[in-house]
Amino acid sequence: MNLSITFGKAMNKALAVSLIVMALASFGSASAAAPVAASDKLTQVRMSIDEDPIVLRLADSLGYLKREGIEIVPVDLEQLTKQDYLMQEPLTKGQIDASYHWFNHTIFGARHELPIKAVMVINDAPGMTVMVANRVKDKIRSAADFKGKNIADGAQYGTKAVITSYLAKKAGVPPSAFTPVMLESEGRLEAVLRGLKEGKVDVMTFQEPVTSALLESNMVSTLYDLNSKASTTKVLGAAFPAQSLLMSPKYIEAHPDTVQHLVNALVRTMRFVNAHTAEEIAERLPADYFDKKDRLKEIKLIRNTLPSYAKGDYSFSPSAVKLVVDAIQASDFDKSEEGQWRATGENSKVKADRLYDNRFVHKAMQAIK
């Protein structure tokens, strides 16, 4: 069976749940911790997936998953836990086998005694741009000038806000010294554009496609480029692991062969991504990836986000992991339920070298050139 990997936050929930039900019906109960061998000899891996990533879609459409004997079954986390950001407990309980999500979730898990590990990095840069309104760019030349400014950087539990605050703190400016604005996700681009015209926003931290839309307005300029490993290292001192493949230590120990085969498939996929243009990548994505989407806009999005993908090396460096840990531990987050989940727990339980396992990706990178 060839499952289309389409579950994500932007996807219609009813359709997502329907897909999961069909998947589980095809393979039987997915409640056991061990992977299940399907009738066509593919090993089922139950995975929670953030958005609709091209890497998993390509791994499927290019045949790399099948080549490694792997079948990914998307799982709706909200059927297992109250929020889709709480993947640590289902992972540690064996309700799911893997999660395609941001590396920082390993830190939150460690804080709450729900240990998970990252076994491969997909994006080694956050894919963000810190921008300054042109009307004040002569006054805001670095994060040291954030004091007293209005800053739009999304929800205050999110990574955009974490990185903005980290830059400010490193420059000696506490988060309390500037004002977060335009926090609502719905209609955010329109709100920021309006705020720029009205002089109500000074600094912005966003990802694509919002970044391009703001830059194309000619009302903002780039202050910090965090879209590639090189540019991120220049700003923050190291790469910043973002989307990664996450698993529980128990699953890794119990099913090393499955982990290796899955990592092999994703390393092959990353080699493909690294070697092709956005247009070439789009040609190899399944047709339904573009359902209800503007194809040209999607290709532009792929093109603009390609720099954030790890190139050649998909392992975790101690310096990169330390950077994410430092940024998270320096963040106050907000008072929302998700913010408090991320803020609470014990920092002393976070051991950076226990947040990742490079064995599988090192082996795959050596074998797959």
Identify the meaning behind each predicted range.
Residues 34-184, 188, 202-208, 219, ...:
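Short, glycine-/small- and polar/acidic-enriched structural segments
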Residues 27-35:
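Signal peptide processing junction and immediate N-terminal pro/mature segment
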Residues 325-369:
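Conserved C-terminal helix/tail region of periplasmic/extracytoplasmic solute-binding proteins
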Residues 188-288:
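Pocket-lining segment of extracytoplasmic ligand-binding domains
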Residues 3-17:
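Bacterial N-terminal signal peptides that target proteins for export
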Residues 253-337:
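Secondary-structure end/capping motifs
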Residues 67, 227-238, 304-318:
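Short, solvent-exposed loop/beta-turn-alpha elements that line the ligand-binding surface or hinge
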Residues 16-26:
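Bacterial N-terminal signal peptides
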